[in-house]
Each structure stands twice: as C-alpha cells, then as structure tokens.
Curated annotation (Swiss-Prot):
InterPro entries: FliN-like_C, FliN_T3SS_HrcQb, SpoA-like_sf, T3SS_SpaO/YscQ/SpaO. GO terms for molecular function: cytoskeletal motor activity. This is Secretion system apparatus protein SsaQ. Coiled coil: none annotated. It comes from the Bacteria. It comes from Salmonella typhimurium (strain LT2 / SGSC1412 / ATCC 700720).
Length: 322
C-alpha cells in the first residue's frame, strides 16, 4: 500500500474518490509520479509552508511568458512576479502570500506516497501542485466545509479497517514502566516484508491477510476474536488456573497498527478464507499502539534482522502516583 503523512490522512475521508472542484482549484488524493519540481515558500498568517509545482508545469509557464525557465538568467523580481501570477488561484483561495525573500528551489516528490494533489489553470497553462510543510488551517481555508450534496454522492462508502503488523503481551506494571525512547519487541502476524499483516473487520472479526503491490488483499485466515489469531502465532502466556494472581500481573494484549485499509462493504458480506479482494488505503508514518482498542502510544517500527521492535516516540499512559 501507499504511505501517507499524518496531516493528510483526514483528507482521504473528506474528499470524494474522484476529487472535488472548489472555485478554481481541483483537489484529489492520489499518488503522483516521482519527478523533479520547483518548491516555493508561502506565508499563511505568519506560518511558512512549501508548494511543490511539477517541473514540466513550471517550465512551460516560464517559457510561454519569457522564453526561458533558467532561474539564474531571470531577474529575481521578474521571477517573483511570474511565480505569483502562476500561483494566484491557490494564493487567493487560501489567503496566503508568496515569500519574495525565499527564492524557489528544485525538489523531487516522494515515491509510493499518497498526497493531496491540487490542480488549477492560468492562461490555459495547467499547474499540478503538492503542499509540503502545511501551515495550520491553510487547506481548511481553501476547502471549508464540503456541501452535504457532495457527501451524499456515496451512500455506501468503503469500510476502513486498521492494519496491524504485530502484537505483544505486557502486564500493567510493564506498561506503566515504559518511557519515550524505549523499545518494545513485537511478534509479527507474518513476514511484513512480504506483506503479511492482520486486519480488524466490522463485527469484531479478525483476519490474517497478504497485501500485494498491485493493491489486492488475500485472506489467509478468518477468526472470531483476536485471541484465536494470536494463539496461532507465537505462544501466549497462560495461567495454570490454580494459583492466585495480582491484577497488575495479568498480561494485556497490545496491538501495533501500521495503517488503514479500505474495502467495499458488499465484498465483505460473503467473505471466506482464500478470497482475494481489491484494496485501498495507506501506511501511516508512525505505528499506533493500542490496548483494548484504546490508543496508548505511538512509535517507530525498527527491523533487527528477522525480529522487529517499536521504539516509543509518544506515550499516553499516566503513571500511578498513589
């Protein structure tokens, strides 16, 4: 699946699949081909952001106006005026300004990245852009609230489900002792380098799946609860049922979410082991750590040979000071 930045994840749910046209701008979530572009600095309420324009768009715009796209051969004030004219629809819609003291630079976009793509036209020249380093509220000012009519285009939207890379068991005492920077070893649901993960379907059903590069998902195993799925992997700690145990020593199932997958709801009604379905979605830049479906932290997935661990970058559990 594709990767996506945290600040762009809400737009996957807000924007229709085919995108939305708002004023002179067309917005859509899509993977843009890896290529060179030109990066401009904008100012939105004293916050700086970056607008990436595909190199072909910028080159055609400059050559159509002054016969060259060579920045070193263009007077800086003239270059600023050309850029401001080309970016005018975006700047006007967002109430941002182009920074004159920050000259444009060359920059390539990222591979396998799902990003918010913004398109507009000036004097029959088409511009394709991606926003880097978003100022707070910048795109909210562009989009505002999408109309109810647009949201009703899809009466049965895809089902979005969490994708888990692995799990571990930790007692309440162990969870309480975790601090930022520490590493937690995880048991994977399969070889994640090959695309093996687990997902949680509606109704509390879990599945072990294989994700492929051509955006399909094969269902290798379907179970009614997460404990059954965990038991088929690494051995879980079990009590002998006779000795007493303190509450703080009871192991908790910790799941590590690495992204979200979307499936058509109609395809899930007769789902069985071995089925292969088309899938959308994206991987998150950080691992989300869950206990009983509650988020308790975030971290970075790190490979250690054939083993994997998550280094804690955010931790939300409060220590008991009583």
């Amino acid at each position: 699946m594709l990767r996506i930045a945290n600040e762009e994840r809400p737009w996957v749910e807000i924007l229709p699949t085919q995108g939305a046209t708002i004023g002179e701008l067309t917005l859509s979530m899509q993977q843009y081909p890896v290529q060179q572009g030109t990066l401009f600095t904008i100012n939105y309420h004293n916050e700086l952001g970056r607008v990436w324009i595909a190199e072909q768009c910028w080159q055609r715009w400059c050559e159509g106006l002054i016969g060259t796209a060579n920045r070193s051969a263009i007077d800086p004030e003239l270059l600023y005026g050309i850029a401001e004219w080309g970016l005018a629809p975006l700047l006007q819609a967002s109430d941002a300004t182009l920074c004159q003291n920050e000259p444009p630079t060359s920059c390539s976009n990222l591979p396998h990245q799902l990003a918010l793509h913004i398109k507009w036209t000036v004097e029959e020249h088409e511009f394709h852009s991606i926003i880097f380093t978003w100022p707070t509220g910048f795109l909210r000012n562009i989009v505002g609230e999408l109309s109810a009519e647009r949201q009703q285009i899809y009466p049965a939207p895809p089902v979005v489900v969490p994708v888990y890379s692995g799990w571990c068991q930790l007692t309440l005492i162990e969870l309480e002792s975790i601090e930022i920077g520490m590493g937690v070893r995880i048991h994977c649901f399969g070889d994640i380098r090959l695309g093996f993960f687990a997902i949680q379907l509606p109704g509390g059903i879990y599945a072990r799946v294989l994700l492929t590069e051509d955006n399909t998902m094969k269902f290798d195993e379907l179970v009614q609860d997460i404990e059954t799925l965990l038991a088929s992997g690494s051995p879980m700690s079990k009590s002998d049922g006779t000795s007493s145990v303190e509450l703080e020593q009871i192991p908790q199932q910790v799941l590590f979410e690495v992204g979200r997958a979307s499936l058509e709801i109609g395809q899930l009604r007769q789902l069985k082991t071995g089925d292969v379905l088309p899938v959308g979605g994206c991987f998150a830049p950080e691992v989300t750590i869950r206990v009983n479906d509650r988020i308790i932290g975030q971290g970075e997935l790190i490979a250690c040979g054939n083993e994997f661990m998550v280094r804690i970058t955010r931790w939300y559990l409060c220590k008991n000071t009583a």
